[in-house]
Amino acid sequence: MSIEVEIKLRISDKECIEETLAEIGFCKGKFVMESDTYYMAEHHDFVGLDEALRVRCVENRGTGERSAVITYKGAKLDNTSMTRQELETSVGDGAVCREILERIGFRPVPVVEKLRQYYHRDNITACVDAVTNLGDYLE
């Protein structure tokens, strides 16, 4: 189990943010399309418990490589940085994983799609996201 520490900020000038990241030493990484399906269930109150269950399908826009992961996110440990416990593992086929969850009673909520540009410096990862119908974000 790992602890995920993240801060999400809505941004108005994506290009300026990307230039600033480069100026302070971040190196551009992979560029991907992520499609996130979150789930609800009658038998588990994800919202009330501040938890999340997600299947993420990823397409690397540079290589065409595809992958998928299933993730459980525990309740936030810190509301400022959205720190939470996270369990994540690869799945061979995201569509099959989604179908399994739906057949055993999990209900998908609207899919969140985003184009994500990764940036790295030392042990820090920054992502600049263009989220469909929601805008641009720095994470």
Residue ranges and their predicted role:
Residues 1-123:
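N-terminal strand-loop-strand beta-hairpin
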Residues 120, 125-137:
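Strongly charged, low-complexity linkers/loops
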